[in-house]
């Protein structure tokens, strides 16, 4: 593991621990809702940083955003027409965020009342905006959005705003843009860390046969070899966990030269996928 990957791995763990500290403080430690809160807040952070990274590379609007002191503050100045125009230029694999969806925009409103409602509404709005590209399809062909309201898991409504602020404070303190060019699989790292933690706490054996990221990379190299001429490949894993092996295969083959399909019976794994 190179130094930059090691740093981002450590930052990922630090972020998880920060979020777990918040959920523990509000009585949600080692619960199913804690797992959902951590993964969804991390995904929101991922969406925010990924969108910013790609928007600043856009040929039309990239220079304007990248030269600004803060890209998200400049993005707040975009008209609705400019936002839609930017969306049309971004690759289909990039999550879309409107100016009011960015982490900085939302965080700057955290001092206002009813912040928990604002956080939940933002997550649901992002899920709806990206439903065609980022969602889970069940075996019954139902579509499950990737985000849902999170602050409802705190039973006391009077504590929800502070809970939301604490969650936002955790994710606002990190920036993962520097690692996107390296194809780092964030979610396999989260999965490995959380599952080990939950199994230790509860004595369970959930996902005891998951494939560690390092092993998945070796398996992908063995399966693909040095073949640089692969085109239009299809990869399917019916028990994918978080998709670590599929991600490794896609990176080895080339993301633009393959299509991956994943499935898992576990609800936790499906959320990760």
Residue ranges of predicted features:
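Non-catalytic, mostly N-terminal accessory regions of nucleic-acid modification and defense proteins
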Residues: 1-227
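Conserved S-adenosyl-L-methionine
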Residues: 205-273
């Amino acid at each position: 593991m190179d130094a930059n990957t090691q740093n981002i791995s450590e930052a990922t763990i630090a972020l998880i621990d920060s979020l777990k500290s918040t959920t523990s403080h509000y009585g949600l430690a080692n619960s199913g809702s804690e797992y959902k809160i951590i993964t969804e807040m991390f995904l929101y952070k991922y969406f925010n940083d990924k969108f910013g990274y790609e928007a600043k590379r856009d040929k039309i609007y990239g220079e304007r955003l990248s030269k600004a002191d803060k890209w998200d503050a400049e993005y707040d100045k975009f008209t609705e027409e400019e936002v839609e125009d930017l969306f049309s230029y971004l690759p289909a694999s990039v999550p879309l965020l409107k100016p009011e969806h960015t982490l900085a925009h939302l965080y700057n409103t955290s001092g206002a009342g009813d912040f928990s409602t604002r956080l939940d509404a933002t997550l649901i709005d992002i899920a709806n905006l990206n439903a065609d590209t980022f969602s889970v399809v069940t075996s019954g062909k139902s579509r499950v959005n990737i985000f849902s309201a999170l602050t409802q898991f705190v039973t006391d409504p009077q504590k929800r705003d502070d809970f939301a602020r604490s969650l936002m404070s955790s994710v606002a303190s990190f920036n993962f843009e520097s690692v996107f060019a390296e194809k780092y699989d964030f979610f396999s790292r989260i999965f490995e860390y959380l599952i080990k933690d939950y199994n230790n706490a509860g004595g369970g054996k959930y996902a005891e046969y998951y494939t560690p990221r390092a092993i998945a990379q070796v398996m992908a190299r063995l399966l693909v070899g040095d073949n640089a001429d692969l085109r239009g490949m299809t990869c399917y894993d019916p028990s994918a966990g978080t998709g670590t092996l599929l991600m490794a295969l896609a990176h080895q083959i080339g993301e633009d030269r393959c299509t991956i399909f994943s499935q898992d019976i576990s609800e936790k794994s499906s959320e990760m996928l």
